């Protein structure tokens, strides 16, 4: 059994009383694993900061465009709390995201975490992602993903046409991985009780675990 796993188990045991506790104050962090995201990273940071995210941890995996410049800009502004420059050429997404979660939890004392991609916008109907976090006694929130139809003449954050899922995509000769397929939900989770994130950030292992569907949507 690895030292990290032993440490996680120790934390889970000590945090048991906090597993489902409602709190009046929430520190919300977002992790981002990026590579060559100059076309969307800045808008992503600005959008989620306005939605209530308190801090970002970013892993940059060998970007060769202006992504590092954008990261430095928002590190200097204090929005990005830590940057990990990952030089590996294999894609260990689950391990790299887990590393960011662990830092957010143990170093920056985050209460809740969103593990996002640079091309995702996590939207709360109330205008603040924290509103639902204050009220829930769950420790995992399942968030519906909604595909957005690309519009060449607009930047991605201005696309406003959502795609309705097709129930029988093979009937229309559509790929099972197309925009028209129903997307798997993604999760927001507490740090208390955290054990492991899944590949793609669609599931998380917690102990104990109590999940609930969320009004937050991912576009």
Residue ranges and their predicted role:
Residues 1-46:
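N-proximal low-complexity "stem/linker" segments adjacent to membrane-targeting elements
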Residues 2-11, 95-97, 124-219:
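Catalytic-site signature of metal-activated, phosphate-bearing donor transferases
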Residues 46-55:
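Short, acidic, metal-binding catalytic loop of nucleotide-sugar glycosyltransferases
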Residues 54, 111, 139:
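Short acidic/polar active-site loop segments enriched in Thr and Asp
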Residues 54-62, 83-86:
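Short beta-strand/loop segment that forms part of the nucleotide-sugar
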Residues 68-112:
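Active-site-proximal specificity loops/subdomain of glycosyltransferases
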Residues 109-123:
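Short beta-strand-to-loop acidic/aromatic patch adjacent to the donor-nucleotide binding site
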